[in-house]
Amino acid sequence: MGKKRIVLLLFISFSYAEITKESPLSIGQTLSSSNGVYELGFFSFNNSQNQYVGIWFKGIIPRVVVWVANREKPVTDSAANLVISSSGSLLLINGKHDVVWSTGEISASKGSHAELSDYGNLMVKDNVTGRTLWESFEHLGNTLLPLSTMMYNLVTGEKRGLSSWKSYTDPSPGDFWVQITPQVPSQGFVMRGSTPYYRTGPWAKTRYTGIPQMDESYTSPFSLHQDVNGSGYFSYFERDYKLSRIMLTSEGSMKVLRYNGLDWKSSYEGPANSCDIYGVCGPFGFCVISDPPKCKCFKGFVPKSIEEWKRGNWTSGCARRTELHCQGNSTGKDANVFHTVPNIKPPDFYEYANSVDAEGCYQSCLHNCSCLAFAYIPGIGCLMWSKDLMDTMQFSAGGEILSIRLAHSELDVHKRKMTIVASTVSLTLFVILGFATFGFWRNRVKHHDAWRNDLQSQDVPGLEFFEMNTIQTATSNFSLSNKLGHGGFGSVYKGKLQDGREIAVKRLSSSSEQGKQEFMNEIVLISKLQHRNLVRVLGCCVEGKEKLLIYEFMKNKSLDTFVFGSRKRLELDWPKRFDIIQGIVRGLLYLHRDSRLRVIHRDLKVSNILLDEKMNPKISDFGLARLFQGSQYQDKTRRVVGTLGYMSPEYAWTGVFSEKSDIYSFGVLLLEIISGEKISRFSYGEEGKALLAYVWECWCETRGVNLLDQALDDSSHPAEVGRCVQIGLLCVQHQPADRPNTLELLSMLTTTSDLPLPKQPTFAVHTRNDEPPSNDLMITVNEMTESVILGR
């Protein structure tokens, strides 16, 4: 009987309903909410000695911590306790009885107790009156739970928002914080220090106007209330999801996360792409996700710095082409006009005009010379702008209508342009009809030339068609001295056109059926993609059995000649390698999120990175690339194509590919750039460890510093190298969900915020056999178990 009693007492001691003066909370004990959803207790990261007091979702693995008491000061001894003081305050004390954290001074004459509510709110309550004396919902961390609030009070100066963790394993305040603004209507900001990083746009009753999926039909879980006394409160409540949270990540991303019983799914993330980054296009510029180039000037404005815009730096913005001469009621040539732009995220620095309808909004702006633009928005009313139009985006659908004041002469410019355009179109149609007639006759005569028909049926604007004799002359009839390389597609030659342009000519192998598909794919894709970190296609040539693709020539050829070359590797010091790494990621970000086409490359590797005369990287070879439509995030194929070693586990074995499979390939590429070793040929030790296994070993021993190419010792930056090794390992994680997305990847490379710890990559446990290395891979998934995978 005695033994049974001891067991019962031990069980009860691990589970508390409340913390009292007589019943403190020790390490190993927890406090649970009455509904069993939330739990409070001591925890540590990666079994370290640093102990924190926090709240998490009970029973969900891995543990998701939503609030930390002592986020800046962990305790390091096992005798720490969470106690109620004689005055009623909640204290965290260490083994020496030093106060590590407290709720602050609380007055409870008859004592107090602490309990955890069903909504995850830790509350200290008066024992007699039951009044709440202190609550964690008024001291937010990086997470907003349902019914908790962000707020401001202009009278008291109080502000309450979210602050990011330094890293996934360090809850101390990081670089980012979230606030709602006191302006009317309010908007949400993610700040990086004192600099805006992301903006939601103004609030319109149930939605933020800068988030396109929150249209007027959106069923909103959010609530924002502003009163006449200068206070504002933002909160949310999910009726359809028992477990949900809004989280600010250490990289500055706001995520709305919902638990589906198996995993946390993000229903919204901001910033979602580089257009979402605050002010990316500068004053009077706007960002267009679906139409490269990414930034444009509003009608009537031109880039302030053409050279900067050509380099892809748009932050200087745009300047007015014709100055305004505003005199209120003036007419004729002196009058101003308004140009409307649809699907717009309302710019920052707006002013609210109360009790004005749509016509009144227009009239108010028209007769106010300082008014540069206006918008009448359902759920808000009239907004006007008298300062720079900053942080503006144009969505493919949704958004608001913005009316911008222009000089009357801008309309005259438009009319003159329309006249010129009309004449040009007429002439062009005549020329096109002539060529079409000739082309029809030529194709009837040369009916076997089906390739040209295929090309003419594709939407390939701006593509130049070269004659075969032109290319033969440029390449000295494809002489061996001009040959740059050879691959599964065919051979690549250097050439020089009569106008002096240097070109690279990819000559399709006539025996390659796969090459035909690659050829068509590459023409259609690359002609529509324009970015400084993507190779540019100039045109093509199709004549008889010859199929040629003509590119801009890259003076320094491909990256592999520098990374793996015994002599040239010395020319690539660490700073230059790091610049190349960042350039590749920017090109990937454009493919995955910023171009009007969402493209998965599927064959990212060192040899497919070309270098121009300034050693700027250009992603090339889009023959295997796939397009994603709308909200599509992954696809599956029965025909797996790619390069062995660079393919992610889920793609190699099941045919599933996504943004995360390109991230895996980049991780391998990154580790090759750092180490100077090729994944298909590397073998280490008696066991013949593969490259990823060796990288993991280096990471465990020295955090990857000893992985660096020995030729770079004098030029290296150990901390930067170690960080890149860690990022590379995060990219080659077995589960796609454990890999960063492309936007997070760029943030990891360009900030110093702490990173999550990588797990051992699955492919890192394998060793190499004695077979020769394979290069390009092309197999069918349902035949995989019976196939021997060899290179082409």
UniProtKB/Swiss-Prot annotation:
Domain spans labelled Protein kinase: 478-763
Stretches of the chain found on the membrane's Cytoplasmic side: 441-792
Q: Which SUPFAM superfamilies match?
A: alpha-D-mannose-specific plant lectins (SSF51110), Protein kinase-like (PK-like) (SSF56112)
Start and end of every EGF-like domain? Answer: 271-307
Active site located where?
D603 (proton acceptor)
Specify the protein name: G-type lectin S-receptor-like serine/threonine-protein kinase At1g61440
Q: Return the annotated region ranges for CaM-binding.
A: 567-584
Provide the residue positions that the database annotates as binding ATP. Answer: L484, G485, H486, G487, G488, F489, G490, S491, V492, K506
Q: Write out the transmembrane intervals.
A: 420-440
**Which residue intervals are topologically Extracellular?**
18-419
Where would one find the signal peptide in this protein? Answer: 1-17
Entry's Gene Ontology cellular component terms: plasma membrane
Q: Its Gene Ontology biological processes?
A: recognition of pollen
One Gene Ontology MF term: protein serine/threonine kinase activity
What subcellular locations does the record give?
Cell membrane
